[in-house]
Amino acid sequence: SIMIYKSDLLKDCVGEADLIIANIVADVIIRLVPELDAHLKENGRFLCSGVLVTREKDVTQALEEAGYKILERREDGEWCAILAARKEERP
């Protein structure tokens, strides 16, 4: 089943999801990255969009430093989307 939450980042979300989607600016995505592990299932994916191409490197760096692997990126004009997953299993 699909459950959709509207929340201040992941504040009101409970449990774990297969996919978390965020269509917000880079600074907010970077702030969100440390919270992902608590809400993503093992092998879960994080899809973010609303990222200016000029800020893509900042977002990918934050994800990679948190243990995520970039699976795919798409670009449309000055915007991009990034799909990421955990590089390794959680302890």
What are these regions (language model features)?
Residues 22, 43-52, 59:
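Conserved beta-strand signature within the Rossmann-like core of class I S-adenosyl-L-methionine
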Residues 1-17:
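S-adenosyl-L-methionine
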Residues 68-91:
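Core SAM-dependent methyltransferase catalytic element
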Residues 27-28, 54, 58:
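Short alpha-helical
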Residues 1, 43, 67-70:
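A generic structural signal for alpha->beta connector loops
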Residues 10, 18-31, 50:
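A short SAM/SAH-binding and catalytic strip from SAM-dependent methyltransferases
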Residues 30-45, 60:
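A short glycine-rich, Lys/Arg-flanked "PGG" loop and its adjoining helix->strand segment in the class I
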